[in-house]
Regions:
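Radical SAM enzyme core and accessory elements
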Residues: 1-27, 31-33, 37-39, 483-611
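N-terminal [4Fe-4S]-dependent radical SAM core
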Residues: 8-38, 45-46, 203, 209, ...
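Conserved SAM/AdoMet-binding glycine-rich loop
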Residues: 39-40, 44, 113, 296-403, ...
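N-terminal pre-triad scaffold of radical SAM enzymes
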Residues: 39-43, 61, 248-274, 298, ...
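Canonical Radical SAM [4Fe-4S] cluster-binding loop centered on the CxxxCxxC motif
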Residues: 51, 252-288, 594-611
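A short beta-strand-loop structural module common to alpha/beta enzyme folds
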Residues: 66-78
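Glycine-rich beta-alpha loop elements in corrinoid/cobalamin-binding modules
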Residues: 75-222, 459-507, 515-529
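Flexible glycine/acidic-rich beta-alpha junction loops that bind and position SAM and/or redox cofactors
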Residues: 77-78, 153, 207-211, 317-318, ...
Length: 611
C-alpha cells in the first residue's frame, strides 16, 4: 500500500497532506500497542491540523500506555479520485495503514457541513456506514466536538458520542475498550458499559417517535440508558493535559502557529452564540502556567507566531500579566504574538501599543448588528460609542485596516437595522479621518455579513431563519448604501447557511438525507469548489424532507427538541428567559456584573466559576 501511495503522490495537489512524517508526530512499535485509534478530522489536512481539540486529544491518547492514536484527514478531490481509481482505501498518516485495520475510529466534528465528509471518509475506508451493520469490536466509531450537542442527524452512523471536553472522558472510553478487547466482549456489552461513562450518548439506546405534524412526540430511553446526558468539563485547567510538543506541519495550514488557550467558557451571553452557552462555565489558566506552556510550545516547534485563544481573549483576567511577560520574550526572538477575539468595549490603548511591538495587522471587531436596539436584542452589550472610541484609539496608534462582522436575519431585524450597518461603517470612516496619524496609505474597511443560523442550546434556538430570498434582498439593500472606495463588502451565499440550519436543528430523519447526498456526490461542503446545493436538494426531495421544517419554521417553546436530552449545563428555563428578554430589548449584563443564573456553574464540583 505504501508503494502505491508513493506512486500516486506526484499526481495530486499538495502531496505533503498525505505523507505524515512531520516533526513531533508520534510513532509507536505495534508490538507494544493494544488499542489503535484512527483519529479522523472530517476536512482537509490544512483545516484539521489547525484544530486545537485535535491536537489536545491526539496527545492525550498517545500518552496512554498501549494506545496509539494516528491522524486521518479527508482527501482533496484529486486524491479521492486517484484512490478510487487504484482501489486505495483511506489510511492513517503515521503508519500509512488502512483505517479499517484500526480498533476505534474517532471523529471530532465542529461544523455541520462536515457531516458529508464523515460518511465519505467511512466509505473510503471500506467501513460500513450504519452502526447496526458493524458487528464486533472492530471499527467502533465514536465522535465528539461541538456538533455532538445535537448528534441526531448522525445517529444512524455513529456508535456513540462523547459530549463536552474530552481530556478525561477519552481516557476512560479508550481504557474501557482496552478492557473489552482483552476480555473479548461483544459490541452490545461494550456499548452498555460505555453508556455508563458520564457524557457518553449511545443513540441506539433511544427511540424517537413523531407527531402527525412532524414534530417530536417523545424520546424513549431503553432500560439502563440515562434520560439526560450531561457534558463533561475540565475543572482545573492548570493541571489539565496541554500539547507542548505540537506536530510541525510539513505543508502550509490555515493557522500555522502555536495556539495558547487562555481560558474556557464565556462571560458574555450573546443570544445567537452556541459556543458562548455550550462552553460554560468559565474556567481560566493562570498566567504562570500559560507562560510556561508558551515557552515550551515555541521551543519544541520552532514556530515564529503564537496566538492567545479563547472565545473572548480580552476578558481574560490575567491578560496584562501574561502579555507583560510574553511580549518581551517574543520581541527578542522576532516571534509574532496575536490576540484575537477582542471586544471593542475592553480593548485598551495600552494593549494596542504593546502589541505593536510584536504584531501590526488589521483590527477585527464583530458588532453583529448596526443599531443599538438590535445589539440589545442579541445581548451584544456593546455601544456605538465603545466601537467608535476603540477604532479612534487604533487609528491614532497607526492602524489603517479594520474588519467589521455583522449578521443579517437576526430576530426582530428591520430594514432600519440593516441600514444602521452602513451608518456605523461611515462613522468608523469619519473616526479614521479625525484620528489617523498616517493617512498616506488610506483606510480599508472590510465589512462582512453572515446569514443568521439558529443553533441549539441558545436563546434563539426556537427562532425561524429568514428565507434565502429575503436574506439576499437585505444584502443588496446594504450594498446599495456603500459608496466609499474605502469599503469592501462581502456576504455569504445563502445556500450553505440554509443547509447548516437544517442540520443544526435536525433530527434522525436527516440521516437518510445525508447518506443520499453523499451518494449524489456531496463532500467537502465547506469548500466553494465542491459545495453543490443540488446534491442536497435532490436528497431532501428523494427522502421526502422539507427543509423549511427546520429553517423558516419557528419552533414552539413547549416543543420537544431533538437535542433536549443533551445537557450542556445551561438550563432551558434560562434560555427561555433570555429569549423573552430579547423581545423586550433587555440586555443581561455579563457574568462579571453578577450571576444571571444560567445553571452552568452546577457542573463545577471542585472550583468556582471564574466569571
Amino acid at each position: 500500500m505504501t508503494d502505491l501511495i508513493q506512486r500516486i503522490l506526484p499526481t495530486v495537489q499538495k502531496p505533503a497532506r498525505y505523507t505524515g512524517g512531520e516533526f513531533n508526530e508520534v510513532k509507536k512499535d505495534l508490538n507494544d500497542v493494544r488499542v489503535r485509534v484512527a483519529f479522523c478530522f472530517p476536512d482537509t489536512y490544512e483545516i484539521g491540523m489547525s484544530n486545537l481539540g485535535m491536537r489536545i486529544l491526539y496527545g492525550v491518547m498517545n500518552e496512554m500506555d498501549g494506545v496509539w492514536c494516528e491522524r486521518v484527514f479527508a482527501p482533496w478531490g484529486d486524491m479521492q479520485q486517484a484512490m478510487e481509481q487504484h482501489g486505495l482505501p483511506l489510511w492513517a498518516l503515521e503508519s500509512q495503514h488502512p483505517v479499517k485495520d484500526f480498533d476505534m475510529v474517532a471523529f471530532t466534528i465542529g461544523y455541520e457541513m462536515a457531516y458529508s465528509n464523515v460518511l465519505n471518509m467511512l466509505n473510503l475506508a471500506g467501513i460500513p456506514l450504519h452502526a447496526k451493520d458493524r458487528q464486533g469490536l472492530k471499527n467502533i466509531v465514536f465522535a465528539g466536538g461541538v456538533c455532538t450537542f445535537n448528534p441526531e442527524p448522525l445517529a444512524d452512523f455513529i456508535d456513540f458520542f462523547s459530549l463536552g471536553e474530552g481530556e478525561e472522558s477519552t481516557v476512560e472510553i479508550v481504557s474501557l475498550y482496552d478492557k473489552a478487547k482483552a476480555e473479548d466482549w461483544t459490541k452490545d456489552q461494550f456499548l452498555l458499559e460505555v453508556s455508563k461513562i458520564p457524557g457518553v450518548y449511545v443513540p441506539s439506546f433511544y427511540e424517537h417517535r413523531y407527531n402527525e405534524d412532524g414534530t417530536l412526540a417523545e424520546i424513549i430511553a431503553k432500560e439502563g440508558a440515562p434520560k439526560v446526558i450531561t457534558k463533561r468539563i475540565i475543572e482545573d485547567l492548570d493541571n489539565a493535559y496541554w500539547p507542548t510538543k505540537m506536530i510541525v506541519p510539513s505543508t502550509e495550514i490555515v493557522h500555522d502557529r502555536a495556539n495558547l488557550e487562555v481560558f474556557r467558557g464565556c462571560i458574555r451571553g450573546c443570544r445567537f452564540c452556541q459556543a458562548g452557552f455550550s462552553c460554560r462555565p468559565v474556567r481560566k489558566k493562570s498566567p504562570e502556567v500559560l507562560y510556561r506552556n508558551a515557552i515550551e510550545m515555541l521551543t519544541n516547534s520552532g514556530s515564529n507566531e503564537i496566538t492567545l485563544s479563547s472565545l473572548s481573549t480580552s476578558d481574560y483576567r490575567g491578560l496584562k500579566e501574561l502579555t507583560d511577560e510574553l511580549i518581551p520574550y517574543c520581541a527578542e526572538r522576532h516571534i509574532s504574538l496575536s490576540v484575537p477575539s477582542l471586544r471593542a468595549d475592553n480593548f485598551s490603548r495600552e494593549l494596542m501599543e504593546k502589541l505593536q511591538a510584536v504584531r501590526k495587522s488589521g483590527l477585527t471587531f464583530a458588532p453583529e448588528a448596526g443599531t443599538q436596539r438590535l445589539r440589545d436584542v442579541i445581548n451584544k452589550n456593546l455601544t456605538e460609542d465603545e466601537i467608535l472610541s476603540t477604532c479612534a484609539q487604533a487609528f491614532a496608534g497607526g492602524w489603517n485596516n479594520v474588519k467589521l462582522y455583522f449578521m443579517l436575519g437576526l430576530p426582530t431585524e428591520t430594514d432600519e437595522d440593516v441600514l444602521g450597518i452602513a451608518e456605523l461603517v461611515y462613522k468608523v470612516i469619519l473616526a479614521w479621518k479625525a484620528n489617523a496619524t498616517n493617512k498616506k496609505r488610506g483606510l480599508r474597511v472590510h465589512v462582512a455579513t453572515a446569514y443568521f443560523v439558529p443553533k441549539p442550546h441558545t436563546p434563539f434556538q426556537w427562532e425561524q431563519q429568514i428565507t434565502p430570498e429575503e436574506y439576499l434582498r437585505r444584502c443588496k439593500l446594504l450594498k446599495s448604501h456603500f459608496y466609499s472606495k474605502s469599503i469592501e463588502y462581502d456576504y455569504h451565499a445563502p445556500d450553505l447557511s440554509r443547509l447548516e440550519a437544517v442540520m443544526a436543528r435536525g433530527d434522525r430523519r436527516l440521516g437518510p438525507v445525508i447518506e443520499e447526498a453523499v451518494k449524489n456526490g456531496a463532500r467537502l461542503d465547506g469548500w466553494n469548489e465542491y459545495f453543490n446545493i443540488s446534491h442536497w436538494f435532490d436528497a431532501l426531495n428523494t427522502c421526502g424532507i422539507d427543509p423549511d421544517f427546520y429553517t423558516t419554521r419557528g419552533f414552539g417553546e413547549d416543543e420537544l427538541l431533538a437535542w433536549d436530552p443533551m445537557d450542556v449545563g445551561v438550563t432551558k428555563k434560562f434560555l427561555l428567559r433570555e429569549r423573552r428578554r430579547a423581545y423586550e430589548s433587555q440586555v443581561t449584563p455579563d457574568c462579571r456584573h453578577g450571576c444571571a443564573g444560567c445553571g452552568a456553574n452546577c457542573l463545577l464540583k471542585e472550583v468556582e466559576c471564574d466569571a
